Amino acid sequence: ASQNLGAPYRSGGTSSSGFDCSGLVCTTYEKANIKLPRSSHEMATVGLKINKLKAQKGDLIFFKTRGNRISHVGIITEVLDNDIKFIHSSTSSGVIISSINEDYYKKRFVQINRVLN
């Protein structure tokens, strides 16, 4: 996914000309021959829910950014002692790496799922 850093946000997008959050995740995982549902809400039902303390690079991280259901997903890129960094496509900045410690994401964090073994 990191080769897509800087790509713009595009609703429904699945290519370097523009990604939405689930499009970035689907495209990245397809390269590993893993087919995921197209929406972040449906992706949250796939794989094994993991405790935040056991998160690993490649796990999916989910947020409620609109209302009361999961509406945003990213891929964990780095796990540090007190931080988890993830790549995602944000509506305002396109494909970027963010931290779970940023207030916006800290307040909206829901779960982490492992779909890779």
Name each model feature, range by range:
Residues 48-50, 76-117:
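Aromatic- and glycine-rich peptidoglycan recognition patches
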Residues 68-75:
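Short, Lys/Arg- and Gly-enriched loop/turn segments at beta-strand edges
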Residues 58-59, 75:
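Structural motif
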Residues 2, 22-26, 55, 71, ...:
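Extracytoplasmic/secreted envelope proteins and their assembly/folding machinery
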Residues 1-7, 115-117:
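Intrinsically disordered, low-complexity
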Residues 7-57:
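Catalytic cysteine-centered active-site loop
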Residues 34-38, 69, 81-85:
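Substrate-binding/catalytic groove segments of enzymes
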